[in-house]
Regions:
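Short aromatic/hydrophobic "clamp" motif used to bind/position activated sugar donors
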Residues: 80
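Acidic donor-binding loop at a coil-to-helix junction in glycosyltransferase catalytic cores
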Residues: 198-204
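A recurrent flexible, glycine/aromatic-enriched loop bordering the glycosyltransferase active site
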Residues: 139-181
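N-proximal low-complexity "stem/linker" segments adjacent to membrane-targeting elements
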Residues: 1-20
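Short, acidic, metal-binding catalytic loop of nucleotide-sugar glycosyltransferases
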Residues: 19-28
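Glycine-rich, basic loop-to-helix element that forms the pyrophosphate-binding segment
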Residues: 58-75
């Protein structure tokens, strides 16, 4: 059985959501509705549905993570399907596709989404009628769409990005609706965080990936997302951006390690390479191979190189990484004083030091930069409490190699 989970503080569109469930070919489902707020009246047509279960207890909960957790904890199904109270499932085969994916061993199932703008307009007879229009995201961020027709209405579905550390690191590029968890994967990942007011699904997707669960795409668009002025994603945009940024900073390295294991990519650690006798003065220009590594780590090593060697290291690392592979660099930050902490250090770094490798204008001025990276993070880190207490900070740059692959986020080079 699939348990469809729907919190609601405004049941205005529940009948449409209900219709999208009734029109499914797969009928082994229950609909768990969790009212959250005062004076919530569930439509009679929904209450008459024998597969509906209304769960009390959410009316005094304030965080969406707690409300969704209550819904999942109250569900009877083998898997949980999230359906927002103002959205719809694509009719016919959506639940069947989801069930098939879980039968094949998936722990998390997701689909493409068609977003539509919805508003009431006045027609030529002065009557208020609904208006539906397609909505798409900026192609500058890597988004692609394709046409679909649902209920006779032309819409545009947005193609999900491949599951990578980069796409999972921010809610904007993570799998959109529909999002579904097997019961096993949900609880092994820890379930929804009841402390989160937004981004609860984003954190749970990260935890699910890190738990080792299999992610599986339904193969097409199976969700219709209604966009209007009162969407939570618009009203709480600043809070969402702040939380998703904190998740990106906290979890990117763990996501990279999980991704390496899932795809069999190797990691090259420059400190370990130096321990084998590798000498950048003699061997740097030989490079590290081509499309060979998923992650290259240079932890407090680049400050020991000359400036031209840093440039050649960046070119060589780029060549050695697979498309979309990751480069992590930690260096002392010059303005805190730590950049001159050793008389033998030859290069000095600030937050702008990766600009020649991530921004076209800076690369063009250098003339010998052949690599193309997207900077994901520039973090202030401290190797020890002593460094922190004295304000001696380091910078950790986390970047992805741009080699022509479809890639989430703006590319400046």
């Amino acid at each position: 059985m699939l348990s469809v989970i729907t919190p609601t503080h405004n049941p205005q569109y529940l009948t449409e959501a209900h219709d999208s469930l009734r029109f499914q070919t797969y009928q082994d489902w229950e609909w768990v509705i969790v009212p959250n707020g005062k004076d919530i009246v569930i439509p009679d047509s929904v209450l008459r549905e024998p597969k509906v279960r209304v769960i009390e207890g959410g009316r005094h909960l304030h965080n969406i993570g707690a409300i969704k957790r209550l819904g999942c904890d109250s569900a009877n199904g083998d898997a949980f399907v999230e359906l927002d109270h103002d959205d719809l499932l694509v009719p016919s085969v959506t639940l069947q596709r989801i069930a098939d994916k879980f039968d094949q061993g998936a722990g998390f199932v997701y689909s493409d989404t068609a977003v539509f703008r919805f508003k009431q307009v006045t027609d030529e007879l002065s009557k208020s009628v609904p208006s539906y229009s397609p909505y798409t995201y900026s192609p500058q961020h890597g988004w692609k769409e394709y046409p679909i027709s649902i209920y006779g209405r032309p819409l545009l579905a947005t193609s999900c990005f491949d599951i990578t550390p980069r796409s999972l690191a921010e809610i904007f590029y993570s799998p959109d609706h529909v999002r579904c968890w097997s019961r096993k994967a949900y609880y092994e990942a820890g379930g929804h965080n009841p402390e989160l007011p937004v981004c609860d699904d984003h954190e749970l997707m990260i935890k699910t990936y890190l738990s080792g669960a299999e992610f599986s795409h339904t193969g097409s668009c199976h969700y219709l997302y209604r966009m209007f002025e009162q969407n939570t994603v618009l009203m709480r945009n600043r809070q969402i951006q702040s939380l998703t940024r904190s998740f990106k900073e906290a979890h990117l390295q763990a996501l990279i390690q999980s991704w390496l294991g899932r795809h069999g990519h190797e990691e090259l650690n420059i400190t370990g390479l130096l321990a084998t006798g590798w000498n950048p003065d003699k061997q740097l220009l030989q490079g590290f191979g081509s499309n060979q590594y998923g992650h290259i780590v240079a932890d407090t090593e680049l400050q020991k190189m000359e400036g031209w060697q840093v440039r050649e290291f960046m070119n060589a690392a780029y060549e050695a990484l697979v498309p979309g592979g990751y480069l992590s660099i930690t260096v002392p930050e010059v303005h805190s004083g730590m950049g001159y902490g050793d008389v033998e250090w030859k290069s000095h770094f600030s937050a702008m030091s990766m600009a020649p490798y991530t921004r076209q204008a800076f690369a063009r001025k250098n003339g010998k930069v052949f690599c193309r990276f997207q900077q994901i993070n520039c973090l202030e880190v401290y190797p020890s409490d002593w460094h922190r207490d004295n304000g001696f900070k380091y910078l950790r740059f986390e970047m992805a190699a741009l080699k022509g692959q479809r890639h989430p986020g703006l590319q400046h080079i």
